């Protein structure tokens, strides 16, 4: 029986490249001249710290970061940006987390979405991934289209296809 896994993974090398490109872009922008603004990638915590002098500039920096991530084929929904900014001294900062893996609540929503579609497939949660098994490839392709079309707030990839 054909099957595949639904996962949510981010290539950290691509994230590193996007952060480096955003930092390089920061040096060429005239509105950030002589302004202490920065991007810091923390690969252990899987987070990106964005810091600048004002909250408006932090929002601009986040837009630059999203643009560079999308050019590297990483969806903007892979970033979890908190509503509140940290303000210390004269710098504002935001610690944007990268979403890796499928949490159990998100996996349950995904399973419910697939089961409500009435496609003839079996769905199992296996740790931080979801396994989908069906009798035909057409059913599996229907599930893939359904998951791509659903807005679940997180990017999903499909891997481990078996016939």
Curated annotation (Swiss-Prot):
> What SUPFAM superfamilies does the annotation carry?
YajQ-like
The family database entries (Pfam families) matched by this protein are listed as: DUF520
As given in the record, the signal peptide range reads none
A cellular component term (GO) from this record? cytosol
CDD domains hit by this protein: YajQ_like
InterPro entries cross-referenced by the UniProt entry: DUF520, UPF0234-like_C, UPF0234_N, YajQ-like_sf
Query: What keywords were assigned to this record?
Result: Nucleotide-binding
* GO molecular function annotations of the record: nucleotide binding
Q: What does this protein do?
A: Nucleotide-binding protein.
Family to which the UniProt record says this protein belongs: Belongs to the YajQ family.
Task: Report what the protein is called.
Answer: Nucleotide-binding protein Spro_1084
Taxonomic classification: Bacteria, Pseudomonadati, Pseudomonadota, Gammaproteobacteria, Enterobacterales
């Amino acid at each position: 029986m054909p099957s595949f896994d639904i996962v949510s993974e981010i290539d950290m090398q691509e994230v590193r490249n996007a952060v480096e490109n955003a930092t390089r872009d920061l040096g060429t922008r005239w509105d950030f001249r002589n302004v202490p603004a920065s991007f810091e990638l923390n690969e252990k915590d899987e987070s990106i710290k964005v810091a600048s002098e004002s909250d408006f500039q932090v929002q601009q920096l986040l837009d630059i970061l999203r643009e560079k991530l999308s050019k590297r084929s990483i969806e903007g929904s892979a970033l979890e940006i908190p509503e509140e900014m940290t303000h210390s001294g004269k710098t504002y900062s935001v610690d944007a987390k990268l979403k890796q893996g499928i949490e159990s609540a998100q996996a349950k929503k995904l399973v419910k979405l697939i089961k409500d579609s009435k496609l003839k497939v079996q769905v199992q949660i296996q740790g931080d991934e979801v396994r989908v098994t069906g009798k035909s490839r057409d059913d599996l392709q229907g599930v893939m289209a359904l998951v791509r079309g659903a807005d679940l707030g997180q990017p999903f990839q499909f891997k481990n296809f078996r016939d």
